[in-house]
Amino acid sequence: MVGNKQVLYKLVVLGDGGVGKTALTIQLCLEHFVETYDPTIEDSYRKQVVIDGQACMLEVLDTAGQEEYTALRDQWIRDGEGFVLVYSISSRSSFARIKKFHHQIQRVKESTSSPSAYPGSSPLAATNPSAPVPIMLVGNKSDRVTEREVSTQEGHALARELGCEFTEASAKTRTNVEKAFYDVVKQLRKQRQQGQSTPRALPPSGNSKSEKYSGTEKPKRPRGKCLII
């Protein structure tokens, strides 16, 4: 299923604290639901997947949502290719902050539109200014129907305003979890086919389908097949 080389896609998960960014990421990569809220600073995962019949490697960066990590977030955005913007349908305040995260993505990507902008960074992280940044807006916790504060229609309207894709998802029931990430990959793949971005390739890894290859100070989560290096 996997050839001699795998194409790498670097995705970054952004959103307010407590909206379920970690739960979505772990559900995607390890197929496990994390019940407890354990604030993240920066966790990275890799998972080998097949999307539309093509094998690839996803590198997913789960990030902190707190305001004090704004400077770090610039670097995370700079290194990312596609983004999953998450709010909770049961939290109006997390929905209201989405525009702030989206603005930060646009600001950072505009400043890194040429490799010379940041000599210390990889030129592959630079963006083509003519190509839109692939973003998926995700209304998480769709299983919490009785606690809903943000309607599906509001989610669609915001996505149209921001010019990005939208879905509601539930990390708990795994509803639309793959869609949230895979649709970003499909956007990136289309851009690469059109010559708007440069593919990243990496040599074949071991037999592990999923890896957590860097962690924070709070690594005590069930990991399933996860390999820590």
Curated annotation (Swiss-Prot):
User: What protein is this chain from?
Assistant: Protein ras-2
Specify the protein's topology with respect to the membrane: Lipid-anchor
Q: State where the protein is found.
A: Cell membrane
Q: Which parts of the sequence bind GTP?
A: 15-22, 62-66, 140-143
UniProt-listed GO biological process terms: signal transduction
Motif Effector region is found at 37-45
Q: Does the keyword Lyase apply?
A: no
EC class of the enzyme, as a word? hydrolase
Q: Record's SMART domains? A: RAB (SM00175), RAN (SM00176), RAS (SM00173), RHO (SM00174)
Q: What is its EC number?
A: 3.6.5.2
Positions annotated as propeptide = 227-229
**PROSITE patterns with a match to the protein in the record:** RAS (PS51421)
**Where does it primarily localize?**
membrane
- What organism does the record attribute this protein to? Neurospora crassa (strain ATCC 24698 / 74-OR23-1A / CBS 708.71 / DSM 1257 / FGSC 987)
Q: Which domain of life is it from?
A: Eukaryota
Q: Which GO terms describe its molecular function?
A: G protein activity; GDP binding; GTP binding; GTPase activity
